[in-house]
Structures are given as structure tokens and as C-alpha cells.
Amino acid sequence: MSRNSGTTLEDGPLHADPTTEAPNNATVTTNVTANDENTEKEVDADAAAAAPAEAPKPNQGFRFWAIVAALAFTALLSSLEGTIITSALPKITADLGGGNSFIWVPNGYFLATIVMLPLMAQASNLFGRRWLTLISVATFTLGSGICGGANSQAMLIGGRVVQGFGGGGIALMINIILTDLVPLRERGKYMGIVQMVSAVGAALGPFLGGLLTSKSTWRWVFYINLPIGGTSLVALFFFLRVAKPPPTTLAEKISRIDFSGNAIFIASTVSVLIGVTWGGAVYPWSSFRVIVPLVLGFFGLGLFVVYEWTVAKNPSLPKDIILNRTAATVLGVTFLHTVATYWSFYFMPIYFQAVKGETSFWSGVDTLPLFAGIFPFAILGGMLLAKFGRYKPMHLIGMAIITLSFGLFSLLDQGSSKAAWACFQLLFAVGAGLMIAILLPAMQAPLPESLVALSTGVWTFVRGFGTVWGVTIPSAIFNNQCRLKAADLSDQGVASHLNSGKAYQYATKDFLDSIHDDATRRQVVELFTSSLRTVWYVGVALAGFGWLLIWLEKEVTLRSKLNTKFGLEEKKKAAKADEDVESASA
């Protein structure tokens, strides 16, 4: 088949390639790149450079851009909520009480965002993308209302869980819909656009949370989502018109859902996240209350894989995804990339507060090169993928830069200049940004388009799981290093705070200001600096392992045309009209 055969998604009716025959029930056709058995095709770099294939552009009419804009606005909604709670949480806890249960305010949201991903991915194939997206936004908005009106910690946590179900659905459906609308080679570019808008919400969150809490009430941290969610619902309702799956009975659709597998997955994931949430915050990591949930959870996840591959009739985790070398490798790289990204997100602010002695507000300002710098490079990475059709070189370059950046972070101390810490953060942003929007297209490259939804669900879960460990691992390292070094402090009263395994909570300007003896304060700053240095050293090892792992990827030719049942609805109607005209002419 010719590389440019098939149909393109462009204005006007779709026309089939006259050299090919399409079955009567064909969907939007494509130039499938020789992957009937999920085999992978190495790209000859010299040949690719000599004769680059030009990917046809997706439809860029009003409907297309309206959908992209609506998805970006919806991403802004969920990303804003992910960070706005951080600066408001102390005030919320003071008003509602609840003791140690406050940790479930952020973690309950996160837990809910990932446990339903495989089920929702499978359901999107059976019930279509549009209504699941609308339900996700509505659920998120409902949860925001519950949180805003909460009169107890339990009600607030319940509202956060409802929010999380919606937020997880939003993240998943945005990625799935983008894969439906644009060819594989073009996806990174549009994912970069959506993620850049999402970054605006993530960057504004802490500032808005502090502003609303100080000028009004913490309840507006949640109420602000109501008009945003309502606007998003209206935009999606009118513009998100994508094709529906083939009509079947409700009973038949329900029978094709992997309820047993998803039950195992949900229970196992909850168990793991309970252990992670309690570890080091409520109980020591050595406590059986932490170890037992972790062991049961990881055992359950292994059982889930076995069940999916041996028993499930309609698995939500098909073998083809995990047993494909490149897809599995990219999943591993995605996990490590996410861990590294959140590693820096959570511990660069610690450097500014615990070493440089800055307030949380100014540490937020000083980390702008990191937070805001990633996403312009995400767009650049997507554009380079669309231009050259190659992801492995950018993965290698990106992870190498991340590894180097962690090494440079280890050089930072109290006397480091603004130029040093700003440039080091920006360098990390270049590496992380180049990769962030092209990981999903790389993972889907060797897989058939029929696995788009399920593979997106798996990839989104791996990213979410990486977020957990991107905070947990460096926190455990930092707390342990502080505990070991606290014995050398001259003031044992100060040492008692840092050797309890909760040093992360004391890595603030307020804690430093509470130490009146200058010599002790200098000792504590050096303790924090040394402990952070170890955190960055481990980050170097982790990112270096990720760089080595990338060499297992194969460079698979990226499909430049769509092959989906869920493209723009109007285009499918136009294609059907063309078929009717051709039949009448015949």
C-alpha cells in the first residue's frame, strides 16, 4: 500500500483512494504501517532523512479547533484543582479539624483519579467518547460543589473523591479524543498545546488558592470550579460531536465490560495508595500498617495481570500492549519521566524554602523557570515529532538533559546565584518538556488503532502512578537523610523534630525562623542542603536508568493518517453520503 493512500480528515467529503477497495463497514481509512501482527518496523535513519514523509494535516476547520479549545479549557479546570488546594489546605484543616485525616484531602482526590481509568477506557469504546467526557466534567463540577459546601472533614474528603473520579475521566478522555482527531504523527503537537494550557492552571493554582483564602474564604477554592465547569460543559456539549460506536443493546455493552478484572485492579490500587499515603506521614515505613497494604496491593496488581491475560474475555489490559517491546519500554520510560518530573516539582521548592530561607510565595516565583518552562518545550517536542516522525532521539536527548540537570541541582547551596538556579531549572524544563507530549504517540506507534482507548488508559494510569512515587521516593530519602544527620546538631530540641521521620514538614522558612541560635540555624541549613544533595544523586541514578532503558525502544514508522471509528461525526456523515452517491452512480 502506498504510504499516502487512504483518506485524510479535511474539509469537505472524504474520498477513498481509488487504488484500494474498502469494505462496506469501513471507518475512516488509513495508511496502516505494516503492523498486522503488531510487529515493529525499524526506521532507517539515512533513508528517512533522505526522503522524509510528509504527514497530511488534520482538519483545521472551526469544528476541529473548537473541540481542541474546549478540551484545553477542560484541562485547565482539572489542572487548576490539582495545585490550588496546596496553599489553602492549612486553613481548611484549621476550620474543619479532622486530625491526621487531612492527608486524604489531596490524596483522596488523587486516588480516585487513577482507580477508574481502565474501566473508563473500556467503557469509552462501548458507549462513545462524548457522553463519558460530559459525565466526567459534570462529576468533577458536582464534587467541587460538595467540597465548597463541606461542613466536616469527612464531607470534604467525600467531595474530593467525587472530584477525583471526574478529574481522572477528564485527563483520560482528553488524550483519547485527541488520538481520535489527529494522526499518530501529529498527536504530540496538539497534546503539547493542551498541556501548555493545563500548565497555566497548575502555575496559577497556588497563587489563586492563597489569594482566595486570604481575601475571601477557602470555599471559593472549590466554588471557582462551578462557572469554569459549567462553561466547559456547554462548550463540549455543542462542539464535541464525534462518531458513536456501532449500535448494540445496553445488555450487550454491559456484558463486554471487564467488571471482575477492574474490581481486582481497583482494590489493589487502593491498597497500594493507602500504604503510600500512610507511610512516613501517619505511620513509620516499617509499620505493618504500611507494609501489609503495600504487599497486598502489589500482589493484587500481579494477580490482575494474570487474570487479564488468562481468564478475561474482554480484557482491559490486553497482552498486545505489555508484550510489545516498544510499547512496554515507553511505558517504563513514561513512569520514570513522571517520577523525575514530580521529583523536581516537589523538591526544588524545598531548596528555596529550607536552604535559601524563602517564603512559600517566593519559592513559587523562583520555580517559575521549572514549572512554566516545561510546556513551551512540550509544544516544540510535538512539532519536531510531526516534522521528522522520530521520537527515540528526542527521548534520549530529553532524558540525558534530565540526568544532567539532577547532577547540577546537587551543586546548589545557600550561596548559589540566581543565574545558577534559574538556568539549572530551565535546563531541566527543556529535557522534561521535549518528552512529555511525545511519550503517548511513541507508546501507540507499534499498536493497532483498535487499542487506542485501552492503551491510553494504561498510559494515563502509569503516569498517575509515577506521580505517587515521584513524591514518595524523594520524600523518604530526604526524611531518612535528615534523621541520620540530626544526631550531629548541637540543639537536641531541634534535632527531635528532624529525626522523627517527618523532616519534610519542617523544611520551611517558618521552622528556620523559629531557631534563634545562629549556629544551630546554620547547622540545620547545612543538614537540609546535604540531605537534598542525596535526593538529587538518587535522581541522577533514576534518570540515568531511564536513559539506558530508552535504547530498548524501536523507531516505528508513525502513521500519518487516521484509522478510527471515533472521528468527527460530520466527516463520517459526509463519507456515508459519498458512498451513497457512488452506489447510485453505479
Swiss-Prot record:
Biased composition annotated in UniProt, kind: Low complexity: 19-36, 46-56
Cellular component, GO, one term: plasma membrane
Membrane topology summary: Multi-pass membrane protein
Region (Disordered): 1-56
Cellular compartments annotated: Membrane
Keyword line: Glycoprotein, Membrane, Transmembrane, Transmembrane helix, Transport
Major location category of this protein: membrane
Entry's Gene Ontology molecular function annotations: transmembrane transporter activity
PROSITE patterns per the UniProt record, alphabetical: MFS
Superkingdom of the source species: Eukaryota
InterPro entries linked: MFS, MFS_dom, MFS_trans_sf
Glycosylation sites per record: N25, N31, N324
Transmembrane feature ranges: 65-85, 101-121, 131-151, 164-184, 192-212, 220-240, 263-283, 290-310, 330-350, 368-388, 393-413, 420-440, 458-478, 532-552
Keyword Plastid in annotation: no
Keyword Membrane: yes
Family: Belongs to the major facilitator superfamily.
Function: MFS-type transporter; part of the gene cluster that mediates the biosynthesis of UCS1025A, a member of the pyrrolizidinone family that acts as a strong telomerase inhibitor and displays potent antibacterial and antitumor properties. These compounds share a hemiaminal-containing pyrrolizidinone core fused with a gamma-lactone, giving a furopyrrolizidine that is connected to a decalin fragment.
Record-linked PANTHER family: MAJOR FACILITATOR SUPERFAMILY, MAJOR FACILITATOR SUPERFAMILY (MFS) PROFILE DOMAIN-CONTAINING PROTEIN
Name used for this protein in its record: MFS-type transporter ucsD
Species this chain originates from: Acremonium sp
Organism lineage: Eukaryota, Fungi, Dikarya, Ascomycota, Pezizomycotina
Gene designation: ucsD
